[in-house]
C-alpha cells in the first residue's frame, strides 16, 4: 500500500453560509475545476455530502466510480439501498468498523442487497487504529503494522484493508479501461 503520494490534493469543506449560492457557483465552475484536477493527477477522489443537493448530485452523475462508506446497521443499509438505486452500478462499497461476528456480516449484506463480492470491501473495527485517528497517528499505525504478523488483531485488520484496496484497485482499473475504450 503506497502511503505517500506525489500529487494528493484536499479541498476542505468550509462553513458555507448559503448552500444555494454555493451550489449555483459550483455548477458554474464544476467542469473547468474537474478538468484542471484531472490534468494534475491520475485519480481524483471527491468527498461529497450524503444528501441530494445539486453539487453532490452533479459530482455523482459525472463520476466513473463512487466509493460508498456504510456501517453494519440494518436501518442505514436498507435506507441507502432503497433510496439510492441509481448509483449502485457505479458503486464500490466499504463497510467501516466492520465486525465479522455481527448479525449483518459481509455474506448477509451481499446476499440481502445483491452486491457482487468484488464490489465490496471491509475495514474492520480496530481499537488501536481508533486511538491513532484520535491522536493524528494513522500513518504511523499503518507503517508499523504493514508487515507485522505478531499482533493478531492488527494482522487481520491489515489483511482486510489490503483486500479492500486490491478490490478497489481492480474497479479503478476497470473504469480506466472503459474510459480508454470510449
Region roles according to the model:
Residues 99, 104, 108-152:
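Beta-strand-loop-alpha "switch" segments that mediate conformational coupling across diverse proteins
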Residues 5, 41, 62-64, 88, ...:
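Short, well-ordered alpha-helix to beta-strand connector turns
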Residues 1-39:
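P-loop/Walker-type NTP enzyme "switch/lid" segment
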Residues 12-13, 45-47, 66-71, 93-97, ...:
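Conserved beta-strand segments of the P-loop GTPase G domain that flank and frequently precede/overlap
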Residues 22-31, 80-102:
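P-loop/Walker A phosphate-binding loop and immediately adjacent motor/lid segment at beta-alpha junctions
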Residues 50-73:
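Inter-motif core of Ras-like GTPase G domains
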Residues 33, 55, 76:
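Short acidic active-site motifs
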Residues 139-182:
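NTP-binding/hydrolysis catalytic cores, primarily Walker-type P-loop NTPases
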Amino acid at each position: 500500500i503506497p502511503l505517500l503520494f506525489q500529487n494528493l490534493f484536499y479541498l476542505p469543506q468550509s462553513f458555507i453560509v448559503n448552500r444555494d449560492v454555493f451550489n449555483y457557483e459550483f455548477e458554474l465552475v464544476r467542469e473547468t475545476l474537474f478538468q484542471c484536477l484531472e490534468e494534475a493527477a491520475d485519480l481524483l477522489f471527491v468527498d461529497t455530502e450524503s444528501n441530494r443537493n445539486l453539487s453532490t448530485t452533479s459530482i455523482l452523475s459525472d463520476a466513473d466510480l463512487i466509493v460508498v462508506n456504510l456501517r453494519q446497521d440494518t436501518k442505514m443499509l436498507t435506507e441507502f439501498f432503497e433510496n439510492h438505486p441509481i448509483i449502485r452500478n457505479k458503486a464500490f462499497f466499504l463497510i467501516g468498523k466492520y465486525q465479522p461476528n455481527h448479525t449483518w456480516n459481509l455474506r448477509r449484506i451481499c446476499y440481502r442487497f445483491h452486491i457482487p463480492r468484488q464490489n465490496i470491501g471491509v475495514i474492520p473495527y480496530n481499537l488501536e487504529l481508533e486511538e491513532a485517528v484520535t491522536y493524528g497517528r494513522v500513518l504511523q499505525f499503518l507503517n508499523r503494522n504493514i508487515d507485522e504478523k505478531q499482533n493478531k488483531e492488527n494482522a487481520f485488520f491489515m489483511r482486510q484493508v489490503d483486500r479492500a484496496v486490491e478490490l478497489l484497485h481492480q474497479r479503478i482499473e476497470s473504469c480506466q479501461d472503459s474510459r480508454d475504450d470510449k
